[in-house]
Amino acid sequence: LPMLLPTITYGFAIIYSFGKQGLLTRLFGVQLFDIYGFNGLLFGYVIYTLPISFMLIHNTMGFIDKKFMVVSRVMGDSNTATFLQTVLRPLLGTLAASMVQCFFLCFTDYGIPASVGGEYDVVATVLYNEMLGSIPNFNRGAVVAVMMLIPSVISILLLHYLERYNVRYNKIST
């Protein structure tokens, strides 16, 4: 359900929870952290991208064969070696793809910076201000839009490249 909400809703949830008159601020009696600027952006982006990362990693964890862990333990590997070779190694492609996906979502997001970004500028707010600001400058806005396009294309190509590192097992026996 959180993935279906507009991103500005996350900013409003942060304001209503952690703001000066927020629910958690009233509960604890003190504002836990400054929600405007970098702190608010970081917190908003984490709660915005956490469900996507969780779904990707959880899905991959379902495809990891548990028999490899048993074999690793029988062969005398330590707990750390078992974890690194049988859990973390198959997850590397998904972890990298999750990081790229989260970067792409945060890079193109406008709602969270608009609500809790404060004076902290991100590319999406710069594009909005150039195109729809008080004095629109379409030439500069077009340059910013093209500059936004380059990391987006690189992200898509990187995701396509990382797809080959996803977990794939062929069943030899049942």
What are these regions (language model features)?
Residues 110-136:
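Glycine-rich helix-loop "coupling/hinge" segments at transmembrane-helix boundaries
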Residues 39-40, 64-96:
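Amphipathic cytosolic juxtamembrane alpha-helices at the membrane-cytosol interface
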Residues 54-63, 74, 115, 131:
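Helix-loop junctions at the membrane interface of multi-pass solute transporters
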Residues 30, 84-88, 129-138, 174:
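Periplasmic/extracellular loop-to-transmembrane helix junction in inner-membrane transport proteins
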Residues 1-62, 90-110, 141-160:
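Membrane-water interface segments at the C-terminal ends of transmembrane alpha-helices
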Residues 21, 115-119, 171-173:
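Short membrane-interfacial helix/loop motifs at transmembrane-helix boundaries
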Residues 1, 70-73, 127, 141:
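Hydrophobic alpha-helical segments that mediate membrane insertion or helix-helix packing
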Residues 160-174:
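Transmembrane alpha-helical segments of polytopic membrane transport and secretion proteins
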